């Protein structure tokens, strides 16, 4: 892990009046960049030339850093270019996937918003389970391996893969049949299979809950809630049951979009309690904790119990559903507030208070 002192040494050489907010052109970059501009920051996007159109058309980026391929963002010349523009990187799922988690931890020497040490805790299922379970949250039962399957389960794989390759099954035979099918399609590798995470299949309504922990205020804020629109499962359910059986199509769970939702108000105490508990436990296990945005992906069962099956320890893709604010984020100040603008506002306040060390790593 890059020492915090080294990152702060780099930041101390910056022109503090010309900080640029930067991210990779993908995932949640539109509201990250737009939010930064609304707070008065200069912005830059890292992109390839064949994917720069959205950032030009929407006008969210002041500068463009072009790479031949996204994995080039970890190269030293790109890092130096970022440091030269006084960059603070806002990481999201695509940034971590392209840069590589090892590089983010050990070689990417550019100041980054949030706690880079916690990113591995969302990527590795055992660490994620340790944090979620240690927080006292209700999580699905975990199975040690396919031979232990004794009922409906969901099989997942590590990393920010947008649900690709996930599948449900009920027996060990079904597990291996689907594994072989996905390997034949090139969706899974032997390494993926070795790291398969098998958990109880919880029946309930899906809620992805987006929080922001402010280290400057020591407070967890509820920013918004969304649901995912997944292919092919959301298209498959439109097919009559008798036709589904005849077609014999195995559903996939690839995230193609998100839509905003509100949760019944009587569940909000539970929602806040979950966020508070996770933020508190994160401070203990991965100091300084869950800085900035995080997400708890949950299912609400018929007993109105929220079961958390996954977390994001950085800005989640579902925050795109409230680029102009959510029914919850607007309650804090009475203004539309995206997650991107909330991030930029925290950075701005940290600079004003000379407490930037509290929000970057």
Swiss-Prot record:
The protein's UniProt keywords, in alphabetical order, are: ATP-binding, Ligase, Magnesium, Manganese, Metal-binding, Nucleotide-binding, Purine biosynthesis
* GO BP of this protein: 'de novo' IMP biosynthetic process
Binding residues for 5-amino-1-(5-phospho-beta-D-ribosyl)imidazole-4-carboxamide, per the UniProt record?
27, 94, 258
NCBIfam families recorded: PRK13278.1-5
Class of the enzyme per the UniProt entry, highest EC level: ligase
Describe the location of the ATP-grasp domain by residue ranges. Answer: 116-348
| Record's function text | Catalyzes the ATP- and formate-dependent formylation of 5-aminoimidazole-4-carboxamide-1-beta-d-ribofuranosyl 5'-monophosphate (AICAR) to 5-formaminoimidazole-4-carboxamide-1-beta-d-ribofuranosyl 5'-monophosphate (FAICAR) in the absence of folates.
Positions with a binding annotation for ATP: 146-208, 230
Which family does the record assign? Belongs to the phosphohexose mutase family.
Q: Does the keyword Transmembrane apply?
A: no
- Enzyme Commission designation: 6.3.4.23
Looking up Pfam families in the UniProt record yields: DUF1246, DUF1297
Locate the residues binding Mg(2+): 297, 310
Q: In which pathway does it act?
A: Purine metabolism; IMP biosynthesis via de novo pathway; 5-formamido-1-(5-phospho-D-ribosyl)imidazole-4-carboxamide from 5-amino-1-(5-phospho-D-ribosyl)imidazole-4-carboxamide (formate route): step 1/1
**Alphabetical list of InterPro entries matching this protein:** ATP_grasp_subdomain_1, IMP_biosynth_PurP, IMP_biosynth_PurP_C, IMP_biosynth_PurP_N, PreATP-grasp_dom_sf
Q: Which Gene3D superfamilies match?
A: 3.40.50.20, ATP-grasp fold, A domain, ATP-grasp fold, B domain
* Gene Ontology MF annotations: ATP binding; ligase activity, forming carbon-nitrogen bonds; magnesium ion binding
Cofactor: how and how many bound:
Binds 1 Mg(2+) or Mn(2+) ion per subunit.
* Top-level lineage group: Archaea
UniProt keyword ATP-binding present? yes
Task: Name the coenzymes or cofactors required.
Answer: Mg(2+); Mn(2+)
Reactions the enzyme catalyzes = 5-amino-1-(5-phospho-beta-D-ribosyl)imidazole-4-carboxamide + formate + ATP = 5-formamido-1-(5-phospho-D-ribosyl)imidazole-4-carboxamide + ADP + phosphate
| Bilayer-spanning residue ranges | none
The molecule here is called: 5-formaminoimidazole-4-carboxamide-1-(beta)-D-ribofuranosyl 5'-monophosphate synthetase
């Amino acid at each position: 892990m890059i020492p915090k002192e080294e990152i702060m040494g780099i930041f101390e050489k910056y022109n503090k009046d010309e900080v640029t907010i930067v991210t990779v052109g993908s995932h949640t970059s539109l509201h990250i960049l737009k939010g930064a501009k609304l707070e008065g920051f200069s912005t830059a996007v890292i992109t390839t030339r064949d994917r720069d159109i959205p950032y030009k058309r929407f006008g969210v980026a002041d500068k463009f850093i072009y790479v031949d391929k996204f994995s080039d963002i970890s190269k030293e010349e790109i890092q130096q270019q970022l440091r030269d523009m006084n960059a603070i990187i806002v990481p999201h799922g695509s940034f971590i996937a392209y840069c590589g988690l090892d590089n983010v931890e050990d070689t990417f020497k550019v100041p980054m918003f949030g706690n880079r040490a916690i990113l591995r805790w969302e990527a590795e299922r055992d660490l994620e389970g340790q944090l979620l379970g240690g927080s006292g949250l209700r999580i699905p039962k975990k199975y040690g391996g396919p031979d232990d399957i004794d009922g409906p389960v969901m099989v997942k794989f590590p990393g920010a893969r947008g649900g690709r390759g996930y599948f449900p099954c009920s027996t060990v035979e079904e597990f291996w049949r689907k594994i072989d099918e996905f390997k034949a399609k090139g969706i899974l590798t032997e390494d993926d299979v070795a790291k398969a995470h098998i958990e109880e299949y919880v029946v309930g309504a899906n809620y992805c809950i987006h929080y922001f922990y402010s280290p400057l205020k020591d407070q967890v804020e509820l920013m918004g809630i969304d649901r995912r629109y997944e292919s092919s499962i959301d298209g498959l359910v439109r097919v009559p049951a008798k036709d589904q059986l005849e077609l014999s199509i195995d559903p996939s769970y690839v995230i193609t979009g998100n839509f905003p939702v509100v949760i019944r108000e009587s569940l909000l105490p539970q929602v806040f309690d979950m966020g508070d508990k996770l933020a508190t436990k994160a401070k203990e296990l991965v100091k300084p904790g869950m800085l900035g945005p995080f997400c708890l992906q949950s299912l609400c069962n018929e007993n109105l119990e929220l079961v958390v099956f996954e977390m994001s320890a950085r800005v989640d893709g579902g925050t795109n559903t409230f680029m102009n604010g959510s029914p919850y984020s607007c309650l804090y100040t009475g203004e539309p507030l995206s997650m991107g603008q909330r991030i930029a506002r925290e950075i701005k306040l940290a600079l004003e208070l000379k407490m930037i060390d509290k929000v970057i790593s």
